[in-house]
């Protein structure tokens, strides 16, 4: 299946911005699951490409001029190949995704919640856990921020999609199931 991608990120500032730096991670690579037929990133200012520890390409862009609006655009054509659900890249150990982060720690009440739902560590029960998290933690815009951790959002019983993702990841890792945000 071929996908034509046109992704745009628009920044609008209430005050003039200057001397900003963006890390742009919108550079897909060809693999056994997809072929990148063409890809282009459009970003104002100067930029350079590098690779991270997982060999992913990313761009660092700098804007030295004053501005109030900034648009970053990624466009291209990707040919996707049929794959099974649940595929894990073989060059990265899934055990890496058991590592806790500040945003994805799991306390005892969260672990109890997860264990009550996940009787068997299978896909069906993990989907059920995700549904139970959505029931427990109501989606409420502007109630959390990018610095809100999974524990705080879980106990506040409200948050946004990133909080739901962090809570699910934290609980999976608490159950010794590798999990990551993709």
Question: Where would I find each of the regions flagged by the language model?
Answer:
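Secondary-structure boundary elements
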Residues: 82, 92-159, 167-169, 174-175
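Active-site-proximal binding-pocket segments
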Residues: 164, 173-182
């Amino acid at each position: 299946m071929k996908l034509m991608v046109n992704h745009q990120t628009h920044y609008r500032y209430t005050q003039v911005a200057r001397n900003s730096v963006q890390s742009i991670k919108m550079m897909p690579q060809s693999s056994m699951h997809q072929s990148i037929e063409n890809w282009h990133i459009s970003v104002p200012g100067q930029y350079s490409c590098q690779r991270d520890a997982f060999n992913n390409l990313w761009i660092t862009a700098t804007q030295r001029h004053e501005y109030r609006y900034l648009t970053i655009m990624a466009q291209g054509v990707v040919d996707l190949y049929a794959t099974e659900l649940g595929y894990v890249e073989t060059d990265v150990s899934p055990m890496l995704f058991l590592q806790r982060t500040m945003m994805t720690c799991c306390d005892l009440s969260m672990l109890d919640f997860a264990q009550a739902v996940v009787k068997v560590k299978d896909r069906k029960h993990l989907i059920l856990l995700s549904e139970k998290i959505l029931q427990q933690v109501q989606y409420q815009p502007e109630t959390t921020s990018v610095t809100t951790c999974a524990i705080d959002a879980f106990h506040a019983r409200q948050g946004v999609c990133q909080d739901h993702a962090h809570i699910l990841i934290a609980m999976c890792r608490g159950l010794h199931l590798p999990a990551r945000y993709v």
